[in-house]
């Protein structure tokens, strides 16, 4: 509950945006040929649980957590950045690549070429709530309070506080939002069954659906290709074109206007978070190789359409 100041949902989104900005500034600060990202962030409920215990039990200045002011916001940001560490390094690699060309007589000629490429590695690591309790020197009572806040019984509370979501129909949105900031997609494509990185936007949607039990229930398919996902929903009459105003939990499919132009086939997918002031807000995997919140105008031309799962 918020009794004054900035709502918690806004502060969380602001910090998520700062985090995305840090990733983008690292990419912009160095010239590279290949980008490899890996790692995962601390989940927001752990960040907020540490913040709640630290705020309410501070022996020098105990405060309630229902309202957010500049001082509390600064503390929350400090805890977030203590729990989440972004590291980066570059490495030059000399590799042999085989190039194919036509000799002009219909014959394919293979030529070995040595190429030196700069790799940019970005890694995200995080501290757990228990590690933060150790770092802050929490007492036994504070640790007990922290553990109680993090029990599964409080998951619906965290969903409401963090994302403003109440009720079971927002379950997949809450799961997707809990993954914002994860990079490289390894948990999602490896869960799907791939041994190495693939374009993982659909794997992410499938993973979120699986966490909610929706794949087993036949509500959302397990799909790694966007075209297959569109076909599954269309066959079941669960499809709307881009003139539709989506609801939270709908699946959005894109047809990017890239160098090859649009072909009426989907090549990217995500989960609808909400619609507000004529814009659709989404959570997307493999957006710049990260899980990110994005937003677009309703009816945006690169949106192919929406799947409407029968939750």
Can you annotate each of these PLM segments?
Residues 43, 139-140, 225, 237, ...:
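Helix N-terminus capping/helix-initiation residues
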Residues 148-214:
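N-terminal capping segments
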Residues 11, 164-168, 193-201, 240-244, ...:
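Extracytoplasmic/periplasmic, Sec-exported soluble proteins
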Residues 215-289:
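...with weaker cross-activation on analogous glycine-rich loops/strands in unrelated enzymes
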């Amino acid at each position: 509950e918020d009794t004054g100041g900035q709502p918690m949902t806004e502060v969380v989104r602001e910090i998520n945006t700062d985090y995305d900005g840090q990733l983008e500034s690292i990419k912009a600060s160095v010239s590279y040929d290949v980008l490899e990202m890996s790692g995962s962030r601390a989940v927001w409920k752990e960040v907020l649980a540490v913040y709640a215990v630290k705020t309410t039990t501070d022996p020098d200045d105990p405060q309630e957590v229902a309202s957010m002011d500049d001082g509390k916001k600064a503390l929350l940001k400090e805890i977030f950045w203590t729990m989440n560490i972004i590291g980066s390094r570059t490495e030059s690699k000399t590799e042999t690549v085989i190039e194919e060309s036509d000799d002009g007589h219909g014959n394919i000629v293979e030529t070995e070429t040595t190429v030196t490429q700069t790799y940019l590695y970005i890694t995200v690591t995080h501290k757990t709530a228990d590690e933060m309790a150790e770092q802050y020197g929490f007492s036994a009572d504070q640790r007990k309070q922290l553990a109680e806040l993090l029990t599964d019984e409080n998951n619906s509370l965290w969903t409401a506080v963090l994302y403003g979501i109440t009720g079971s129909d927002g379950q997949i949105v809450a799961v997707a939002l809990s993954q914002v900031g994860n990079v490289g997609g390894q948990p999602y494509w490896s869960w799907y069954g791939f041994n190495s990185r693939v374009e993982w936007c659909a794997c992410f949607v499938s993973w979120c659906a699986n966490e909610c039990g929706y794949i087993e229930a036949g509500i959302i398919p397990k799909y790694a290709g966007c075209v297959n996902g569109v076909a599954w929903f269309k066959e079941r009459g669960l499809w709307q074109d881009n003139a539709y105003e989506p609801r939270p939990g709908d699946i959005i499919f894109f047809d990017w206007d890239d160098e090859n132009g649009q072909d009426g086939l989907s090549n990217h997918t995500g989960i609808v978070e909400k619609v507000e002031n004529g814009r659709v807000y989404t959570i997307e995997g493999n957006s710049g190789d990260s899980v990110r919140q994005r937003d677009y105008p309703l009816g945006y031309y690169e949106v192919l359409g929406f799947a409407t799962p029968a939750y």
